[in-house]
Swiss-Prot record:
Signal peptide: none
InterPro entries: Alkaline_phosphatase_core_sf (IPR017850), BPG-indep_PGM_N (IPR011258), Metalloenzyme (IPR006124), PGAM_B_sf (IPR036646), Pgm_bpd_ind (IPR005995)
Isomerase keyword on record: yes
Gene name for this UniProt entry: gpmI
Protein name as catalogued: 2,3-bisphosphoglycerate-independent phosphoglycerate mutase
Description of how the protein assembles with itself and partners: Monomer.
Sequence positions that bind substrate: H124, R154, D155, R186, R192, R262, A263, D264, R265, K337
Family, similarity comment: Belongs to the BPG-independent phosphoglycerate mutase family.
Binding-site residues, Mn(2+) 2: D13, S63, D445, H446
Binding site for Mn(2+) 1: D404, H408, H464
Amino acid sequence: MDRPPMVCLVVLDGWAIGPDYPGNAIRAAHTPVMDRLQATYPMTTLRCWGRDVGLPDDQMGNSEVGHLNLGAGRIVYQLITRIDLAIEDGSFFQNEAFQRALDRARQPGRTLHLMGLIGDGGVHSHQRHLLALLELAARAGISRVAVHAFTDGRDTAPTSGIEHLRELLAALDRLRTGFVATVSGRYYAMDRDKRWERTKLAYDAIVCGLGQTARSPLEAIERSYAQGITDEFIVPTVIVDAEGKPLATINDGDAVIFFNFRADRARQLTQALTDAGGFTAFPRCRWPRDLLMVTMAEYEPHFPVLVAFAPDIVRVPLARVLSDVGLRQFHTAETEKYAHVTYFFNGGREEPFPGEDRLLVPSPKVPTYDLKPEMSAPEVTDAAVQAIVSQRYAFVLVNYANPDMVGHTGVFAAAVAAVECVDRCLGRIEQAVRSVNGYLVVTADHGNADEMLVPGTNEVWTAHTKNPVPFILVAPNHSPFRSVALRTGGRLADVAPTILEIMGLPQPEEMTGRSLIVAPSVGR
C-alpha cells in the first residue's frame, strides 16, 4: 500500500469549551495558537460525557473513559451503563447467569443470596441493580431471598446508608419477597488490601451467623450511628429472629449473586467463598459446598463463578488497525497520563502492538502541580517533535496533562499558566507537522480548566465538567481536507474513524463511530 499521510493526534487533557465567566481559565489565558487554529481550520465540538462515552446519563467524563472511546472508535459502555441498558431493554431479566441462580434457588431448601454495596454511589455498585435483581426474584417466585447489605459512606455521604436501607426495605415490602440477613460496612466486606481479618468478620457473619447481632437492619445502623460509627465502618452484624437465630446464612448448595460491578473490592470475599482448596488467608468458620455463585462482572478470570456481564473487549482499536497494515506509530505523555495514551487508548491492552513505540516522560516531583503548572509539557513536546520530524511514524499520539492536573488543584492563576504553556507547545507541534506535510488533529478527552468556580459564587470547583471539547482538523494547504465541513453532534468515538478517513484506510466493522468529515473538497 502507498504510505498514508502522517497524522498527529494531540489530546489536550481537561480542555473544553466552557462558559464565558470568571472561572474559565482557558478563556482567561492568552492562547494565540488555539485561537488561530479555531478561526482558520475546520472545527466542531464533541460530547464527552454521559451516554456519549458509555457512562450513565449526565455523568461527567474522565481520562480513562475518554481515551478508551478515542482509541476504540466506538462507544465503550462502562459496566454500570451496560447493566442499566440491560434493565431498560429487559435483557437483564433473561440473563443466563441469573437464570442459573434462580434455577438453583428453586430447589427445596435453597436460598438465593444477594450480596453487595447498597446506595447510589455508582462506583462499585448501584442500588437500582439490586432492586432489579429483587424484581427478577419476585417474578420467578423465589421464596427465600436473603440480602447481605454492605453500607458505603465513602462514595456516598457518611450516614446516607440508613436512607438507602429504607429504600431497600420498602422495595422488599412492595415486592413481597426477601429480607435483609446481614449488614456490614464496606471497610470489612470490601477490603482490597489483604487485611483479611476484616474480610473474616464479614465472612463469619454471612456464612456462619457469627458476630454482633440485631433484631432488624435499621437497628444495626441506628446503633452504629449512636456509637459514632458511620456507614463505611459498621461492624458486620447478623440479623436474628426473636429466638436469636440468624435469619439466613449461606449454606451448602445455595445460590449467591454478588452484584458489585467493580472487581477490586469484591475479590477477597469472593475468593473466601469459592476457593475449595488452598485458601489460607484466614481459618473459615465453615465453607459452603456446591455453591452456585454469580458475579455481576468478571472479578478474576480463574474464579469458579458465573459472570453475568462479561468484559467488553475492544478488539480492534485504532492502534491495531494501523499495526495490522504495517504502519508505525508513536505514543507519548508524561507519567500522569501515560496509561491513557497506551493501555486505555489501545482498548485495555498493556503490550504495544507491533510497530508501536512509546515514550514515558516523567512528571515533575512536586507536592502539587500548581507549583509547576508547565509540568513536563515542554519535554513531551520535545519527544513528539522528534518523532514527527523523523518521518518514521504514520501516527503520533500526544497528551498534554496540564489543563486537567493543574485544574484539579483549584488554583486559577496556575491553571491559566498551564493552559498558556500547552498553547505554546501546541505551536511547536503544529510547526513540526507542517514541516512533513502531515495532518494535525487537536481534541480533548473531557473538560476541567474551563470551569474552576461554581457559577455565581467564589467557591472553587476542582472536578471535571460537562462541556463539549474542540475538534480541529489542520490539513496541509494542498490537501483536499483543507476546507472540509465537519458535522455537529459528534462524540469522542468519532475521532478514530475520522483519522482513518484522512489516512485513506478502511474502517473496521467493530468501529461504529462515524467520521466527522461530511463534505470533502471537490477533486478529492
